[in-house]
Amino acid sequence: MKRFYFSLLILITSVSAVFAQKDAKAQAILDKTAAAYQKAEGIAITFGGTQKGTLLLKGSCFYLDCAGVKSWFDGKTQWSYAQQNEEVTVSNPTAEELQSVNPYALITSYKTLFNYHYRGFQTRNGKKGQEVVLTPRQKGEIQSITFTVSADYEPIYIGVKLSNGKTQEFNITSYQTHRNLSSSIFRFDAKKYPNAEIIDMR
């Protein structure tokens, strides 16, 4: 369940088999959001809602601190640290596996994995933005994703409706771009966790 929260973030934080299922307005918003993400370089995000946490992004790399779990990904290797049992799992995830753990997989996967439609202007957490609803082309744990962006095409809100009827909500409280993020931020530093048990799955 802890790992599943990664896929809910701006899954980030982030399509259709049949053209008739596409919505031109929704696609334009998603395309512009993806372009803004690519230009933003280093990004620092804080979020609240169902879970509170911090997310740092740079290209394909990310660092996530949420729900008692910290996760680092340097573009090849992923380290996931569970604070409760002081275990670090190390893996080299495949592209397919990254879809379930990369918090910004939505940014690169919406064109192939989702259908989507435009929902108009909505106010979320006191902020007004344009909203798009995405539905997965294949059935799974996620039933739909509601994605709200500002006039600058930065995420304001993400709501993930699960197949069990529950909804996970993420309100973006801070979104800072062009941050100078060192590559070391996206790698696990064993010296900072001397008591952690390393479980190498590579």
Pin down the residues of each PLM region.
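Sec-dependent N-terminal signal peptides
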Residues: F4-S14
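An acidic-aromatic
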Residues: K52-V101, K166-Q168
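A generic structural motif
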Residues: G48, D65, Y81-Q83, T135-R137, ...
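Short, exposed beta-strand/loop patches in secreted or surface proteins that constitute
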Residues: A36, K52-L57, K70-S71, Y116-T123
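Short, solvent-exposed coil/turn segments at beta-strand boundaries
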Residues: K39, L55-Y63, W72-Q78, K127, ...
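Gly/Pro-enriched, hydrophobic low-complexity segments
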Residues: R119-P194, I199-D200
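N-terminal leader/targeting segments and the immediate start of mature chains
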Residues: S16-K52, L56-C61, E86, F188-R202
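Flexible, surface-exposed loop/linker segments and immediately adjacent secondary-structure boundaries
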Residues: P93-K127
